[in-house]
């Protein structure tokens, strides 16, 4: 996907097209008032107050029609500068523009004129509205003014604009592809998860089939961790505010946490992360240097108060389950343990055929003594240790100043999904700070107490986000071991007793041998039931008729294919079990 904000040519053009859209809206809705209309990575948008009118598909069509008129008229676009007082007078009837103007420094303010429309704007813009003719309004939504839930709702219209119709057409094709890959659409078609505003925004619920996928991911990563000596625990979803004051999260992360709850005179909070709980588990008993490293893992439920505008299905929610672990090590073990984590990340990526990723070493900003723990020696030691491992492993990475956690540097592995923007999937963070805050110690070789170092790491990140990622990469065509339903039996004729008996016999046979199988006996035509299985991305479709009953065989077809293969049921089972055991994965 093109980045409209980063591309200077597209940035200017889309900025101008936002004004064309605003002009068209003003023609159709004279009462309209406008907040901001910036260019973003995905194109442009404008936040609009239409009073009692609402935006719907019919309104979008009418706005596009009016925009075409504005472009066809080919009005010159002029920039002029006026004083702040003149701007206040010009926009005196628009409270949104007045709010913007009041926030500006004294001095001249730029406005842009195009025909009968004038807007407050820094620019730059193209010089004529006719240059904006290759546009498309792509979506609309309701948003809170200034992103504050305490404010009223405005209507946001998104669009894109290109220099040529060919570029626009190509982009619209990509948008359609993105819609087909959107994990929210796939999740609905496959009955994986749901959400409801009565439960709460950003609080998705996994349905039986979605939870099956979730459990398979959990089993997969926990098995890999157990082989490496991880010890799995379970800790509560809440903690006292004092716990998070001790860890420093209350000072550094409070804005991302849910409000505290008062219970019997004590303040509790939903946890945003699991480190404090795991620190307390380590502190539960005395440790010797011979015990280290100790690797504590958990599939943990976490809660973060994400802004409503950033919520996106199971990719980004206010509740999620983290594939979390904390490694308690001696200073001498830092490099070997960090190296093992990096190997685990890329071994996992190999299993899932994840190849499009970028490694980022996130470092502190030495000048920011407020955000970051103020210990230069600690930071230099930690950052150099991570650099050395990455260099020794020959891993390409970039460094980003000011992106570290408040307690230490980290390695983020960012993926570029099939749709949308890059985000972090896996992370490993080095921490000299938290063990000191919790007074964690171990008895060293010389009999003295020493403070361990902690590696925070998440391989799959959150299971929710990881599931969203693979759903979009595969368009829902999950590998057999991960598919919620691995095979579906469809008897050709539901009213045939002998056929129904064989169908249920096969159902029991496969189920008893560990295959996730179901039967579709609905009173629908065969073609309808086959199409339903295709939509739900069932990997193996079993079509049974009289011949299969007579021969004790299975006729199956793979998802997306028309060819049917007939084999003995024992051979079919062996084929499925082999594919599951080898964890054959998908091709992107």
Predicted regions and their residues:
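NTP/phosphate- and nucleic-acid-binding module
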Residues: 1-35, 39-41, 47-588
């Amino acid at each position: 996907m093109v980045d409209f904000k980063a591309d200077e040519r597209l940035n200017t053009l889309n900025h101008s097209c936002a004004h064309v859209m605003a002009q068209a809206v003003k023609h159709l809705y004279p009462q309209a008032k406008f907040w901001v209309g910036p260019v973003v990575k995905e194109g442009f948008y404008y936040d609009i107050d239409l009073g009692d009118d609402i935006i719907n598909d019919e309104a979008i069509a009418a706005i596009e029609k009016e925009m075409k008129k504005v472009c066809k008229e080919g009005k010159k676009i002029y920039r002029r500068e006026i004083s702040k007082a003149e701007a206040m007078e010009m926009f005196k009837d628009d409270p949104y523009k007045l709010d913007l103007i009041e926030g500006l420094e004294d001095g001249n303010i730029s406005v842009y004129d195009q025909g009968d429309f004038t807007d407050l704007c820094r620019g730059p813009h193209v010089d004529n509205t006719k240059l904006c003719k290759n546009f498309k309004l792509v979506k609309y939504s309701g948003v809170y003014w200034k992103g504050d839930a305490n404010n009223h709702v405005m209507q946001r219209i998104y669009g894109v604009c290109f220099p040529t119709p060919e570029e626009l057409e190509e982009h619209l094709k990509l948008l359609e592809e993105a819609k087909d890959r959107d994990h929210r659409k796939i999740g609905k078609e496959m009955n994986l998860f749901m959400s409801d505003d009565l439960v709460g925004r950003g609080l998705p619920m996994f349905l039986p089939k979605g939870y099956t996928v979730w459990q398979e991911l959990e089993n997969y990563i926990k098995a890999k961790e157990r082989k490496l000596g991880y010890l799995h625990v379970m800790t509560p979803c809440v903690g006292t505010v004092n716990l998070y004051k001790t860890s420093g999260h209350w000072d550094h992360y409070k804005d991302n946490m849910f409000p505290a709850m008062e219970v019997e005179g004590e303040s509790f909070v939903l946890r945003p992360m699991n480190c404090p709980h795991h620190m307390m588990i380590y502190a539960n008993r005395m440790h010797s240097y011979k015990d280290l490293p100790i690797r504590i893992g958990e599939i943990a439920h976490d809660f973060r108060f994400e802004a409503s505008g950033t919520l996106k299905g199971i990719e980004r929610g206010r509740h999620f389950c983290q594939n979390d672990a904390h490694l308690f090590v001696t200073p001498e073990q830092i490099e070997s343990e960090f190296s093992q984590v990096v190997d685990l990340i890329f071994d996992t990526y190999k299993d899932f055929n994840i190849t499009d990723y970028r490694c980022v070493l996130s470092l502190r900003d030495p000048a920011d003594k407020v955000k970051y723990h103020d210990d230069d020696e600690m930071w230099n030691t930690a950052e150099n240790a991570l650099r050395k491992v990455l260099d020794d492993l020959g891993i390409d990475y970039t460094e980003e100043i000011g992106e570290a956690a408040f307690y230490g540097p980290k390695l983020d592995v960012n993926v570029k999904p099939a749709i949308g923007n890059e985000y972090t999937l896996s992370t490993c963070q080095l921490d000299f700070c938290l063990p000191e805050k919790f007074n964690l110690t171990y008895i060293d070789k010389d009999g003295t107490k020493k403070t361990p170092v902690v590696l925070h790491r998440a391989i799959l990140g959150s299971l929710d986000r990881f599931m969203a990622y693979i759903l979009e990469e595969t368009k829902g065509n999950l590998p057999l071991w991960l598919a919620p339903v691995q095979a579906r039996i469809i008897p050709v004729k539901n009213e045939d007793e002998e056929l129904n008996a064989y169908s249920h016999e096969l159902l029991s046979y496969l189920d008893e041998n560990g295959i996730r199988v179901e039967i579709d006996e609905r009173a629908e035509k065969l073609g309808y039931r086959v199409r339903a299985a295709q939509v739900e991305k069932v990997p193996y479709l079993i079509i049974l008729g009289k011949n299969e009953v007579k021969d004790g065989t299975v006729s199956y077809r793979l998802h997306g294919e028309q060819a049917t293969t007939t084999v003995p049921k024992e051979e079919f089972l062996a084929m499925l079990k082999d594919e599951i055991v080898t964890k054959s994965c998908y091709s992107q």
